């Protein structure tokens, strides 16, 4: 069954809270909820989880059984019929059915509760359930499947056992079998139906998604066994085969979609989304946090995998699989001090060299498994999409936010270490520095680039993993403490903040009377700015932040970093740290970058340049290009998101420092407060960041987070309005889009982090640029694809262009000898590995500065002839073009004749490049008979400058045939 994204996301009933939120979720990067049709087919996403593609019959029995109990359940079941495949036996319910069933009557649920629980366990209909009961059902389901996809930490309860209710929570009847989730079950619905979530629920991270069964309390009476059997039989006909690993990105996107996780995507409810507890967090934001979370990264990578099977899917490590049961709780050290600053409007000084924060970000962690290893990360994301000014002793909005630089996730240097060690000490991120220097060469390690006069929200992420390389597959638990929100400034604006810093920070020498006039100077500046009163009242700040959490049911209230502010007093001039940038911006850059990769090569080139400034490698530059492209979209997204965020932001306080438990659900599951989304975003950000520093640096503890992937709910922590993304952003789901996202050029910072994570996961597609730098042969189809060199020529196809970074014109432009491409010919064997060829081959045409495109399998857009063309020069181009489309030939000719010269700077340069390419091609040809195809590719690559690595055999073969023509001309 192929679902249209619209069908999946928009088919929900109008009265469904998800439906209402759907409009707001339009910005979801992976799944556009927009009304406009998208060519993106969810089938790719569903394929992983939908082993059963065909049967609408599986749920018919369920429908009947439920129909007896509840009319609504019947309706839900009916919807499910469409989505459920016979194999899955109802394991996959259409998302709309889940949502529509969110309103199922409790009576029907109660009647069928035991049967539903059992059935749900067997059929995994409770994919979207966020209540503890539902979660337990999901756990049961996963047990039945034998593989637990959910990232939740709670041990699965025995199948058929009614989900235990959380202590202190009124028992919630399990949702109907078919209505995979009751209103409280759906993450979105959870937000929509606060009545189901007692305020106490969100305080413990375990509540909702990850809460271990609290006990039988409130369990609905089991339904008559015969009824149960019927439902189970109907739903369980064939036990659904364990669903393939779901693309993390796809899962995140779907899970974060307003409709809620799509049951089809999450077989057996293996992925449980922590329930949002609106009661606990009146200000909780709906799905789609402003931040890109680690989960976003995982999801994005998963989506990419779906699009590009060659890439290893990022799989969330199932916490249940490792047998570790933990219920992490995080508290912010120095909370009182943070609150003092927050009341006045915390300001953090950012400097070119980087300034530590004060109060410091310090946390205490409890509830960890003593033996299991954990990785702790911190990132700083834009709290909203506004620029502020301090006027009349108060902070006020001064306009839309500036584009955010790629944000990075700062990995605690002690990571990974055992829970026992983490719990014995205060976890301090005092070494993290805030800077406004976009060219900071060391920023990817310990600094985060922020924009002055912008508001940022630090986020604390806890991941159970024994290796940083496993981050992409791990469950991120994100904790956000609203009181740690701050505005980045180059000089303190509010005198009260200055005084607070002086009073509490022993290192705030610059502002003391003995500060050699530094304080006076700053005060003068502040006075000029009219700093007299609180720069921001917390409410305003929170409202500003709302967009960040908008994507989520709410800002993860449970995320309350209690950093010991006093410890980092030395960083009196704490700088604002925007890891993610406006939640929308980072997200946007990711998805948007993909789009722009397709649509805006020039922007991508700029972004690439930007990334290079950031110190990223060529791959980083590509990511940067995406980021740059994203930046523009980012602003619009920010504005849109901000409006939404402001609405949601008000109540989204990280009042529940412990409430992260919900986030514990899993990388794919949004944290109960939506932290998972943030977590995903963080992961995505981390991946992007990793890519930004240079694809190869992923393992570094600091995950440099560029704008994280735009996790829809989870994937788009940065929540850029979908409108900002061209439809191509959906392309993330598309193979080309995914490839683009994976391709360095296509990667935005968020993707970069994902890419970095993927790199750690050995996803060449994500880290194709990294591989190119490393000289590894790109394995993923994306790598096989040529990344466009940001050539002036538009790429032939949006999809192709994203991955075929090199358009016929673009390749031709560099055809002389791409800095690495020409090398491809010389590289010979190296050429086979596009990246290697780049590194090994001489770069006869340094004149063409476009970053070497990461070898992507030759995109259809870039004909092999292009590769030949550079070699042949004008004539060679003609020969090579023989097999290319007229437009391609023309572009090639232009490239060879004039464009090539332009890139090289002169005809002579072009000629020299061609000569080098020819020599390299000849050398390659002679040296690598066994790689003839590759040789041809290398020749072509020389001409294309970045076609060098084209692992795809068929492409190679094609190139080879062309090579015959090309080599003839070239060698001659």
Curated annotation (Swiss-Prot):
Q: Kindly list the GO CC terms recorded for this protein.
A: chromatin; nucleus
Q: Which residues form the DNA-binding region?
A: 332-513
Pfam families reported in the protein's UniProt record: Optomotor-blind, T-box
Biased-composition ranges, Pro residues, are 155-176, 213-225
What start and end residues bound the annotated signal peptide? none
Q: What is this protein called?
A: Optomotor-blind protein
Q: Which residues lie in Gly residues bias regions?
A: 818-831
- Modified-residue entries (Phosphoserine), positions: 887
What high-level taxonomic lineage is stated for the organism?
Answer: Eukaryota, Metazoa, Ecdysozoa, Arthropoda, Hexapoda
Q: Where is the composition biased (Basic residues)?
A: 274-286, 952-963
Gene Ontology MF terms in the entry: DNA binding; DNA-binding transcription factor activity, RNA polymerase II-specific; RNA polymerase II cis-regulatory region sequence-specific DNA binding
Q: Name the gene that codes for it.
A: bi
Q: Which organism is it from?
A: Drosophila melanogaster
- Region (Disordered) residue ranges read 44-248, 263-286, 508-563, 645-676, 805-889, 918-972
Q: Which InterPro entries match?
A: Optomoror-blind_N, p53-like_TF_DNA-bd_sf, T-box_DNA-bd, T-box_sf, TF_T-box, TF_T-box_CS
Its transmembrane ranges are none
Tissue expression profile of the protein = In third-instar larvae, expressed in the brain region that will develop into optic lobes and more weakly in the thoracic part of the ventral ganglion.
Q: Where is the composition biased (Low complexity)?
A: 49-80, 97-142, 177-193, 201-212, 226-237, 835-851
Q: Which UniProt keywords apply?
A: DNA-binding, Nucleus, Phosphoprotein, Transcription, Transcription regulation
UniProt-annotated location(s): Nucleus
| UniProt main location, coarse | nucleus
Keyword check for ATP-binding, yes or no: no
């Amino acid at each position: 069954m192929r679902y249209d994204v619209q069908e999946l996301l928009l088919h929900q009933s109008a009265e469904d809270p998800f439906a209402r939120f759907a409009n707001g979720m339009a910005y979801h990067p992976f799944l556009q909820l927009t009304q406009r049709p998208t060519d993106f087919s969810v089938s790719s996403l569903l394929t992983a989880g939908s082993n059963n593609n065909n049967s609408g019959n599986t749920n018919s029995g369920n429908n009947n059984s439920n129909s007896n109990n509840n009319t609504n359940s019947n309706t839900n079941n009916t919807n499910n019929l469409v989505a459920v495949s016979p194999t899955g036996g109802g394991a996959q319910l259409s998302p709309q059915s889940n949502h529509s069933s969110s309103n199922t009557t409790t009576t029907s649920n109660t009647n069928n509760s035991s049967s539903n629980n059992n059935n749900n366990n067997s059929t995994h209909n409770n994919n979207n359930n966020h209540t503890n009961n539902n979660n337990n059902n999901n756990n049961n389901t996963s047990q039945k499947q034998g593989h637990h996809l959910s990232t939740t930490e709670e041990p699965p309860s025995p199948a058929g056992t009614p989900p235990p209710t959380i202590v202190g929570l009124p028992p919630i009847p399990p949702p109907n079998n078919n209505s995979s989730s009751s209103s409280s079950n759906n993450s979105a619905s959870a937000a929509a139906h606060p009545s189901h979530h007692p305020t106490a629920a969100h305080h413990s991270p375990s509540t909702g998604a990850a809460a271990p069964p609290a006990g039988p309390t409130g369990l609905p009476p089991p339904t008559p066994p015969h009824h149960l059997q019927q439902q189970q039989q109907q739903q369980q006909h064939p036990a659904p085969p364990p669903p393939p690993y779901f693309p993390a990105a796809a899962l995140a996107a779907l899970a974060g979609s307003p409709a809620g996780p799509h049951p089809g995507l999450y077989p057996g409810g293996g992925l449980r989304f922590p329930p949002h507890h609106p009661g606990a967090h009146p200000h909780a934001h709906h799905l789609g946090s402003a931040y890109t979370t680690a989960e976003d990264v995982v999801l994005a990578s998963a989506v990419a995998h779906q699009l590009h099977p060659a890439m290893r899917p990022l799989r969330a490590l199932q916490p249940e699989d490792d047998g570790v049961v933990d219920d992490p709780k995080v508290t912010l050290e120095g909370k009182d001090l943070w609150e003092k600053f927050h009341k006045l409007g915390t300001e953090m000084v950012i400097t070119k060299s980087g300034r530590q924060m004060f109060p410091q970000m310090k946390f205490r962690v409890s509830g960890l498994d003593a033996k299991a290893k954990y990785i702790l990360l911190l990132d700083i994301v834009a709290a909203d999409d506004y620029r502020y000014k301090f006027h009349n002793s108060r902070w006020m909005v001064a306009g839309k936010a500036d584009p955010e630089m790629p944000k990075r996730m700062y990995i605690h240097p002690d990571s990974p270490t055992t829970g026992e060690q983490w719990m014995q000490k205060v976890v301090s991120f005092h070494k993290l520095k805030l800077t406004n220097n976009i060219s900071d060469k060391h920023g990817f390690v310990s600094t985060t680039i922020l924009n002055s006069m912008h508001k940022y929200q630090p986020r604390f992420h806890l991941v159970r993993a024994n290796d940083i390389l496993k981050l992409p597959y791990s469950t991120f638990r994100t904790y956000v403490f609203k009181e740690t929100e701050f505005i980045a400034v180059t000089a303190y604006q509010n005198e009260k903040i200055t005084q607070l810093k002086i009073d509490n920070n022993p290192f705030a020498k610059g502002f003391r009377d003995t500060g050699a006039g530094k304080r006076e100077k700053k005060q003068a500046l502040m006075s000029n700015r009219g700093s007299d009163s609180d720069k921001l009242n917390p409410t305003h700040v929170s409202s500003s932040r709302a967009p960040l959490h908008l994507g989520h049911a709410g800002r993860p209230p449970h995320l309350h970093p209690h950093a010991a502010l006093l410890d980092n007093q030395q960083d009196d001039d704490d700088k604002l740290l925007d890891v993610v940038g406006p939640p929308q911006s980072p997200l946007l850059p990711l998805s948007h970058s993909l789009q722009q990769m397709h649509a805006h090569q020039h922007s991508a080139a700029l972004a690439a340049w930007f990334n290079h400034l950031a110190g990223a490698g060529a791959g980083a530059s590509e990511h940067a290009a995406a980021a740059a492209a994203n930046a523009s979209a980012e602003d619009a997204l920010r504005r849109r998101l901000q409006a939404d965020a402001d609405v949601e932001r008000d109540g989204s306080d990280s009042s529940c420092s412990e409430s992260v438990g919900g986030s514990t659900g899993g990388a794919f599951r949004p944290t109960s407060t939506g932290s998972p989304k943030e977590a995903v975003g963080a992961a995505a950000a981390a991946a992007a960041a990793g890519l930004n520093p240079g694809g190869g640096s992923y393992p570094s503890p600091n995950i440099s987070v560029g704008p994280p992937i735009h996790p829809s709910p989870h994937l788009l922590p940065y929540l850029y309005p979908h409108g900002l993304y061209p439809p191509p952003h959906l392309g993330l789901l598309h193979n080309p889009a995914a490839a683009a996202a994976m391709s360095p050029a296509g990667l935005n910072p968020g993707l970069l982090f994902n890419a970095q994570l993927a790199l750690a996961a050995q996803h060449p597609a994500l880290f194709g640029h990294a591989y190119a730098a490393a000289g590894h042969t790109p394995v993923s189809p994306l790598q096989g694809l040529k990344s466009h060199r940001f050539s002036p020529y538009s790429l032939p196809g949006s999809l192709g262009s994203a991955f075929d970074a090199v358009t016929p014109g673009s390749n031709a432009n560099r055809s002389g000898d791409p800095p690495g491409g020409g090398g491809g010919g010389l590289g010979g064997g190296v050429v086979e590995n596009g990246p290697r060829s780049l590194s090994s081959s001489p770069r006869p045409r340094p004149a063409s500065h476009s970053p070497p495109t990461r070898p992507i399998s030759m995109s259809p857009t870039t004909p092999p002839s292009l590769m030949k063309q550079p070699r042949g020069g004008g004539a060679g181009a003609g020969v090579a073009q023989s097999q290319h489309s007229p437009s391609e030939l023309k572009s090639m000719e232009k490239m060879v004749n004039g464009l090539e010269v332009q890139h090289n700077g002169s005809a002579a340069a072009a000629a020299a490049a061609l000569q080098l390419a020819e020599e390299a091609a000849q050398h390659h040809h002679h040296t690598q008979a066994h790689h003839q195809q590759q040789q041809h590719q290398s020749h072509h690559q020389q001409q294309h400058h970045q076609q060098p690595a084209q692992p795809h055999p068929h492409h190679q073969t094609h190139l080879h045939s062309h090579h015959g023509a090309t080599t003839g001309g070239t060698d001659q």
